[in-house]
């Protein structure tokens, strides 16, 4: 593991031990960065911001789903859950629908997912009809549907894998 990868791993590992594992970081052993190279301050800041996003999302597990809900007291729908997490964790204002969220940031391939990425699904015979936050280890956290609560689920579960529509990595500069 090179120095850059070690820094990222340590920053995330000490932020939230429940989800920080090297597999979820997609660290590439072939990265040829020198031992003395330090990631730019903005990049390091975003890595620590990811921990805030994941921690805030986990704090909300168990809260009920409510269509159009946007507060912990009343419940959340999927997109309002994502919007709330990013606002509370980073003071970033995101759009209120899964479809509009899908247009933000950089498109990410399934195999390149990193914690904090938004994952999208076709759950209503419509592209980008559901959204969650990737937390690592092929898992994501989301507000599923009426009668359910915010929870962590496996992306590799057949139901979600068949409905996976894509992922994006939110650029904080886009939201200002």
Predicted regions and their residues:
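Sec-dependent N-terminal signal peptides
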Residues: 6-13
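Aromatic- and glycine-rich peptidoglycan recognition patches
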Residues: 2-3, 19-31, 37-45, 108, ...
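N-terminal targeting signals for Sec/Tat export/insertion, comprising classic cleavable signal peptides
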Residues: 29-59, 63-66
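N-terminal signal peptide c-region/cleavage motif recognized by signal peptidases
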Residues: 15-17
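Catalytic cysteine-centered active-site loop
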Residues: 40-44, 63-115
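Structural motif
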Residues: 116-118, 138
